[in-house]
Structure formats: structure tokens, C-alpha cells
A protein has these predicted regions:
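Surface-exposed patches in mature extracellular/periplasmic domains of secreted proteins
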Residues: 194-196, 258-262, 266, 346, ...
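C-terminal lobe and pocket-closing loops
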Residues: 338, 356-360, 382-385, 431-452
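Short glycine-biased active-site loop of nucleotidyltransferases that positions the nucleotide triphosphate
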Residues: 135, 213-217, 357-361, 414-415
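Short, solvent-exposed turn/loop segments enriched in Gly/Ser/Thr/Pro and often Arg
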Residues: 148-151, 202-203, 347-356, 410-416
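Non-catalytic accessory segments of hydrolases
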Residues: 1-169, 193, 380-391, 400-411, ...
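C-terminal domain-tail junction helix/linker
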Residues: 413-440
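Substrate-gating cap/lid region and adjacent catalytic-acid/histidine neighborhood
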Residues: 223, 230-238, 254, 258-385, ...
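Serine-hydrolase-like catalytic core of hydrolytic proteins
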Residues: 77-254, 305-327, 337-342
């Protein structure tokens, strides 16, 4: 079978996927960018683009890929990255596509565009928990992306603002460029450019939050999913870019750079070392790698945008796990966000993953949403397989129509002022039910989080 397709950029060749009848197109360059410059979209290539292997990941702290570098990250390293090999570079603006092998232009399949988490400092678009999502077997096109991380993606300096008219938010400009590339090219993979659902977890969910608040992303997507982050989040309310200048000036000084040209030419390892040394200083708490009001991607703070009712009015799914980072806070965020938007649905995941570290901790639901349980070392049972299949059905139904409900699925009700229950996914049969916020608060205060 040929995996060649003709896109507006040129001919591209993919490869078979672990799922029968599914084709994968890996490492597609969607843009190029100089350090702390806006991404330039890729619109053409010569010859046949080889999309049979993943592209490099964004340079990131060793804690994300070296087990010995940071014991505090060992849990997540063992869960999601152990045994994997990644390449790290400053040339990393790649995306990946999975689609039915027989999908043709004009099929107009719904598209799920996934943004990975990692605290805006780590991760990539082909970690093993979403390497080969099952969604195309349900008639959806899957897309994952890389974007700029850490100091690569968030530096704010007056010299950069003078140069380009704005500074900061480079990570989000990458996500915007990837969305624009998908809109322009996804029909060649059988996808519907007018039916794109953006989805993210943790920092990826916070990215979704920023995308639905931005005035320059309208028309690029029609639905949104936020897992363990995002919503009406005071944790990530964008500050003016100027508020971050002292932090990044200190990083620049710590790196021994006196000019922007020197800072741009600094080796990545030295840049990340300087950033790491400064971010732990108490006077810079709450500054660094986060969204800013730059006058371009974001022109208002999140609360200002919501007060003006200028967020995207589209269907939303939003939820969290029972042992998440700050579950009571995420609970309130989910309720507040859904109450502001019609056709919004919230979930609560409490499945205790099997193993010697049982729990429904932050990120534990990813294996289920992507249908990639087989990639994990854990002794999953038939119950886990059935739960994952159910969650995938809800998600792909939502991507298709904006309503997660379907035949043979327990009814998932929208959130309203009168209906505040969550869809409970996990230990009990799936059902609508309340969440004991006091129990979540007790757990957060008394039970150590994984990795601690």
C-alpha cells in the first residue's frame, strides 16, 4: 500500500501504524523560527517529504529525559519516558498525523489537535502515551505537535519588543502556526479543516485556555478539551510582558550576556542553566515560562476577556483526576468555565491505576484517552480496557459533533446552573455524580503526590 499524499505543500510519504488500516505521517515541519522570532509557516517543499520518522524535540531540562538528573521527576520518567530515545534540538517545529489509510480528500473527518503538557518546560508530540492514538480507528484524524519550551518559548525583553513589536508567547505562536498549517493541509489526509477540536493536558490544557482567549485564533477550531488545567485558571492569568522583564534580564545577566545578539547566540545548555538558576530565586516567584499580555496574541488578561464575554463560545470538555496537582482548585475551574459556556461537559477521573503505586494521579488518564494502554508497563485489566474504550468513544463523538453522547454510552449531561454533577470515570460504573471537594482537599493536604 502506498502512503503518499499530495498536500498544498507538496507530496508526502508516511508509514503504517500499529493499528491496522491506519497511516502515520511523522515529523512534518510546519514552520521554522529563529530564536525568539515569530514562526514562519512552511508552504512548500521539493520532492517527496519523508514523514516516516519523528522530528527532534525542543531542547529542555535534563530532568525530563535523564533519570539521574532530577529524582523528583523519576516517577514521570519511569511512567512515560523510560526506554524511549529522543533527539533534542533548536530545530523542532514538527507535527505528526495519524489517519485512516484509505481516508481521501473530501472525507471531511473530524480532527483532534493535541497539545502536550510538561509545565511549558518539557515534553514533545511523540511521547509513548500518545504515540499512535486509537482515534483514527473511530474515524478521526489525530495531530500532535512540538512547540518551543522553557526559555526558548517565553523570553520577554524590551529589546525583543522593540525589534518585533511584541515579546513573549513564542510557544503559543508556534501552536497557532501549527493550527494554521493543519487548516491549510489536513484535507489531503481526509480531515475537515472546519471541524478541528483542540485538546491539551496540564500545560497543554493551559495552552488551550490561551488559544480560546486569544483574539487572533478565531475560526481555527470549533471545540476544545482541557484536561487537568485551563478553565478559569488564576494559576495562569497572563501578566503584562513588562512584568517579566526583570526576570529575563536577570537570566541574561546570569548567562554573562550584555547584548541581545550574545543572548541569542548562547548555547542552549548555558541558556537553560542560567534560567534554572534564576527561577528558584524567591523574588521571581510567579514569573518566567508562562503566557503574557503582549498586545498581539493576548491583548487582555484572562479575567478581562471573560468579563467582556470575548472567549470563544464553542463546546468544551473539561475535567481532572482525583489526585491531581490541586484537585479542589481544578474542580472549581471546571465548574466555573462550563457555567460560562453553552454545551460544556465536565468529567472526574478516579480510576486507581494498577501497580505498586496505585492512584489517579496527574496525567494518569492519558493512557485511557489515547487508547494506548498497551504501551504502558502496568498490569491493566479488562476493566481498564473497557474504560479506555468508553472514554475514546466520548472523545471522538465530541470531536465529531460537539456532543460526547452516543449509543451504548451512559448519558453525559451538560453543566448548567442547576446541573453541576460531573461524569464519573473510574472505580465505579460510569455515571453522573457529585464530587466530594472536602475529600479532595484532605487528600491534597495529607497524601504525598507521586514523585514526592
Amino acid at each position: 500500500m502506498s502512503f503518499e499524499r499530495t498536500t498544498p505543500c507538496g507530496v508526502i510519504s508516511g508509514t503504517a501504524c500499529q493499528w491496522p488500516g491506519i497511516a502515520a505521517y511523522k515529523g512534518i515541519r510546519y514552520a521554522t523560527a529563529g530564536r525568539w522570532e515569530s514562526p514562519i509557516p512552511v508552504t512548500h517543499w521539493d520532492g517527496v517529504y519523508d514523514a516516516t520518522r519523528y522530528g527532534a524535540c525542543c531542547y529542555q531540562p535534563r530532568a525530563f529525559y535523564d533519570e539521574a538528573a532530577a529524582p523528583g521527576k523519576a516517577f514521570y520518567y519511569n511512567e512515560f519516558r523510560k526506554g524511549e530515545t529522543y533527539t533534542y534540538s533548536e530545530d523542532y517545529l514538527f507535527l505528526n498525523i495519524w489517519t485512516p489509510a484509505d481516508a481521501a480528500p473530501g472525507d471531511r473527518l473530524p480532527v483532534i489537535f493535541y497539545i502536550h503538557g510538561g509545565g511549558f518546560t518539557g515534553g514533545c508530540g511523540h511521547e509513548k502515551h500518545f504515540d499512535g492514538p486509537v482515534w483514527p480507528t473511530k474515524g478521526c484524524v489525530a495531530v500532535t505537535i512540538n512547540y518551543r519550551l522553557g526559555p526558548m518559548g517565553f523570553v520577554c525583553l524590551p529589546a525583543l519588543a522593540d525589534e518585533a513589536g511584541s515579546t513573549g508567547n513564542y510557544a503559543f505562536l508556534d501552536q497557532l502556526a501549527a493550527l494554521q498549517w493543519v487548516r491549510a493541509n489536513i484535507a489531503a489526509f481526509g480531515g475537515d479543516a472546519n471541524n478541528i477540536t483542540i485538546m491539551g493536558q496540564s500545560a497543554g490544557a493551559m495552552s488551550v485556555q490561551q488559544l480560546v482567549l486569544s483574539p487572533i485564533t478565531r475560526g481555527l477550531f470549533s471545540k476544545a478539551v482541557m484536561s487537568s488545567g485551563g478553565g478559569v485558571s488564576q494559576m495562569l492569568t497572563a501578566k503584562p510582558a513588562e512584568a517579566h522583564y526583570p526576570f529575563w534580564k536577570q537570566v541574561m545577566e546570569t548567562a554573562g550576556c550584555s547584548t541581545l545578539a550574545e543572548f541569542r547566540a548562547l548555547a542552549p545548555a548555558r541558556l537553560f542553566a542560567a534560567w534554572d538558576a534564576v527561577r528558584t530565586q524567591p523574588q521571581f516567584k510567579g514569573l518566567g515560562c508562562e503566557p503574557v499580555v503582549d498586545g498581539r496574541f493576548q491583548v487582555k488578561t484572562g479575567p478581562e476577556t471573560l468579563a467582556a464575554d470575548e472567549q470563544h463560545h464553542i463546546p468544551y470538555l473539561i475535567g481532572f483526576t482525583s489526585e491531581d496537582i490541586v484537585p479542589p482548585y481544578l474542580y472549581q475551574m471546571a465548574q466555573d468555565w462550563c457555567a460560562r459556556n453553552a454545551d460544556s461537559y465536565s468529567w472526574f477521573f478516579d480510576r486507581q491505576l494498577p501497580g505498586d503505586d496505585r492512584g489517579a494521579w496527574h496525567s494518569s488518564d492519558l493512557w485511557y484517552w489515547f487508547g494506548t494502554l498497551a504501551h504502558c508497563w502496568r498490569p491493566f485489566t479488562e476493566k481498564d480496557t473497557a474504560l479506555s474504550a468508553q472514554m475514546v468513544d466520548y472523545l471522538t463523538n465530541f470531536a465529531r459533533t460537539g456532543d460526547p453522547n452516543g449509543a451504548d454510552l451512559p448519558q453525559w449531561q451538560t453543566v448548567t446552573a442547576q446541573q453541576t454533577d460531573f461524569l464519573r470515570l473510574g472505580e465505579e460504573p460510569t455515571h453522573m455524580g457529585s464530587v466530594d471537594v472536602q475529600k479532595l482537599l484532605w487528600t491534597m493536604q495529607n497524601v504525598p503526590a507521586v514523585g514526592e
